[in-house]
């Protein structure tokens, strides 16, 4: 395993740039013993995949990065780990597929899962079906004035309830979390369609007991593969089941104003689900909602 330095008691997640000589102060080499042989594990290179316009998690930038790295030290690259499938697939298609270098991503996007049959080595499903449900279910419960756990850990009047193995609630942060699951060559066929709702929470709410409400929901980057191709389609399926009339706003992944400029009349909505470009920009939204 690798050992990363700490900053103020937390693991330092900064990218190392290039670290082919192992001299980085951010990450230290690790070792791995297999069949009596000890191997050095080194983070050769890492960077934030941000394009020239400022958009992060950028697939094209990742594809360019692996081409640059492979030209400089490609024979040293034994495995690629990407923080999302959009970037992982860009590197897989640009270089690692042709060079048989194991590549792993995150998100379990449909194209990445399908690519496992063609050599993409694996990804992580963050249970987008559960994430999307939780997003809208918390809003539905708040609008109905019922216990926040209704239809989540506690069965609702339509029979909706999540199983314990797909989510957990953290009391300290008052947050629900969907649990991750590895997607590999052994189970990828179960994840080929990433837009299927979770069956135990796919029961229609009664419109009399749960009348239609209007919701404004934004996604910080409409160009993000996971958000646009997996998360939003799931939201659109659940909003019908939960009797929510949702206006979806897709941002550019760069500026808060691109989103807030499209919230001109907050009073027409009953609830809001906000996905900020930067997590320290909450005031941009609360200022509008307080008008």
Please provide the spans of the model-predicted regions.
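A residue-level marker of the well-folded mature domains of exported/periplasmic proteins
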Residues: 1-291
């Amino acid at each position: 395993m690798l050992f990363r330095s700490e900053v103020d008691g937390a693991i330092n997640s900064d990218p190392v740039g290039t670290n082919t000589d192992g001299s980085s102060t951010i990450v230290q080499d690790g070792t791995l013993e297999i069949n009596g042989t000890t191997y050095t594990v080194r983070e050769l290179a890492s960077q934030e995949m941000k394009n020239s316009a400022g958009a992060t998690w950028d697939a094209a930038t990742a594809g360019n990065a692996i081409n640059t790295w492979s030209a400089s030290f490609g024979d040293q690259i034994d495995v690629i780990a990407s923080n999302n499938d959009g970037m992982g697939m860009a590197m897989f298609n640009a270089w690692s597929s042709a060079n048989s270098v194991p590549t792993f991503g995150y998100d379990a996007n449909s194209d990445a899962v399908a690519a496992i049959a063609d050599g993409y080595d694996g990804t992580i499903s963050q249970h987008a079906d559960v994430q999307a449900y939780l997003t809208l279910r918390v809003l539905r419960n708040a609008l109905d004035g019922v216990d926040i756990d209704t239809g989540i850990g506690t069965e609702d009047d339509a029979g909706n309830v999540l199983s314990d193995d797909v989510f957990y609630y953290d009391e300290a942060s008052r947050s629900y979390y969907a649990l991750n699951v590895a997607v590999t060559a052994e189970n990828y066929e179960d994840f080929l369609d990433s837009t299927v709702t979770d069956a135990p929470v796919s029961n229609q709410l009664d419109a009399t007991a749960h009348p239609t409400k209007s919701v404004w929901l934004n996604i910080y980057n409409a160009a993000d593969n996971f958000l646009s191709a997996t998360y939003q389609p799931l939201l659109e399926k659940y909003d019908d089941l939960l009797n929510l009339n949702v206006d979806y706003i897709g941002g550019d992944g760069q500026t808060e104003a691109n989103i807030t400029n499209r919230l001109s009349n907050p009073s027409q909505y009953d609830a809001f689900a906000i996905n900020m470009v930067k997590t320290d920009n909450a005031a941009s939204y609360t200022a509008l909602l307080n008008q």
